[in-house]
Amino acid sequence: MIAAANCLETEKAKLRREIAELQAALNAKEQNLRDLQSRTAASHLDPEADLQHATREQYATLNNDDIARYSRQLILSDFGVSGQLKLKNSAVLIVGLGGLGCPAAQYLCSAGCGNLGLVDYDEVERSNLHRQTLHTVARCGMSKTESARIALLELNPHCRITCYPRLLNSSNAMHIMRAYDIVLDCSDNVATRYLLNDACTMLRKPLVSGSALKLDGQLTVYSYGAQGPCYRCIYPVPPPPEAVTNCGDGGVLGAVTGTIGAMQALEAIKIIIGLGDVLAGRMLIFDGSSCQFRNIKIRSKRPNCHVCSAQPLITGLIDYELFCGMNANDKDNAVKLLEPEERINVLDYQRLMKTKAHLLLDVRAPAEFEICQLPDSINVPLAHVLDDSYLQRFAQQLESKELPIFVVCRRGNDSQIAVQHMRTRLPEHSIRDLEGGLHAWTNQVDQSFPIY
């Protein structure tokens, strides 16, 4: 009886703590909402207000606060007062306030860039916080541009910040970008890269392009100088959608995005003040696993480039989602490879798993399988499933061809690839995909199941 009472007290204490944590989170959300409502009411914003550019002032001198704040870079012989004034009078547009955009914005703002434009359509999520260092737990659910603006003004209240909380596209890109001297591509999708490249080339603005995935990063500057290539000179044709991996699928270490994002800020500063050798016509490749940097030469301008050549074929912005065959965002695109009868929804599977003998294959990588898994699932990574010799050995070990096989992955994309391949190689077996994957399981069946 005493032990049971102690267990009950422990459980009650745990529930009280959870309630307190939820109440604190709710209070923070309500405060964020009040802040946003008060700012909106104060400024009488109209629906297109986020497309109105901040007025750019030109400064001829530094004030005492500038001298005190930027003293450590002012004393650099290659920087000095003239360099600081160029920064103060500059305007930089950052597209994407994620793992690259946050450190880039942070260092540009701290260095004294006078005007920053922030473009991002998304809201802050918990999965962002390990690498997107301007955002906080309290600001989860807030627009990324607004969250970044709050953090940046705490760093440097003298920086003019204009937020564009929307998806950059062919209809608004030229209007937004025209007001800025330099554009930083901190996006995580191919369609936006082509859009930014074409717009920067047409507007004759340098494009500082960074990317990071897993433990690797890349950095270069496009559309800079007479011989500097544009993105299309290097990649005239977009890759097939199935060959593209983003951070959501492949993963990334926060310190890697921080490294590349900080160096994007450095390249922007160099361009603004005319310092050093700008990374145009070259690409910096960072290998985080060995902490090595390599600097490789890339091709010069392509004489027949469709955008930057003397006689371009593309003279206006196009439909980049159509051109690339993928969405202009970093969200995972749901693939549709299977017929409805080749799939099962998670609610039907939940009922079946308790009553019918079957085999559940999880085709995620071992590192992901270790994070969480459904009961009695077997980890067979997708690479193994696509290996015909492995698949034949697997089939030989099955007790019966009558045993139904279900396949699951994180979001229901890789599992479709696996099922499609398995059904052609093992036609005598009943093989179906778990529609929506583990994300659907969390959303529809068990909300306590971890989501990542």
Swiss-Prot record:
Binding-site residues, Zn(2+): C230, C233, C305, C308
Enzyme Commission number(s): 2.7.7.80, 2.8.1.11
Keyword Metal-binding in record: yes
Reaction equation(s) it catalyzes: [molybdopterin-synthase sulfur-carrier protein]-C-terminal Gly-Gly + ATP + H(+) = [molybdopterin-synthase sulfur-carrier protein]-C-terminal Gly-Gly-AMP + diphosphate; [molybdopterin-synthase sulfur-carrier protein]-C-terminal Gly-Gly-AMP + S-sulfanyl-L-cysteinyl-[cysteine desulfurase] + AH2 = [molybdopterin-synthase sulfur-carrier protein]-C-terminal-Gly-aminoethanethioate + L-cysteinyl-[cysteine desulfurase] + A + AMP + 2 H(+)
Residues covered by the Rhodanese domain: 354-450
Annotated binding of ATP, by residue: G99, D120, S127, N128, L129, H130, R131, K144, D188, N189
Active site: C247 (glycyl thioester intermediate), C409 (cysteine persulfide intermediate)
Cofactor: Zn(2+)
One Pfam family linked to the record: ThiF
Pathway of action: tRNA modification; 5-methoxycarbonylmethyl-2-thiouridine-tRNA biosynthesis; Cofactor biosynthesis; molybdopterin biosynthesis
Keywords, comma-separated and alphabetical: ATP-binding, Cytoplasm, Metal-binding, Molybdenum cofactor biosynthesis, Multifunctional enzyme, Nucleotide-binding, Nucleotidyltransferase, Transferase, tRNA processing, Zinc
Family statement: In the N-terminal section; belongs to the HesA/MoeB/ThiF family. UBA4 subfamily.
NCBIfam families, alphabetized: PRK05690.1 (NF004281)
The protein's name: Adenylyltransferase and sulfurtransferase MOCS3
Organism, as annotated: Drosophila virilis
The gene coding this protein: Uba4
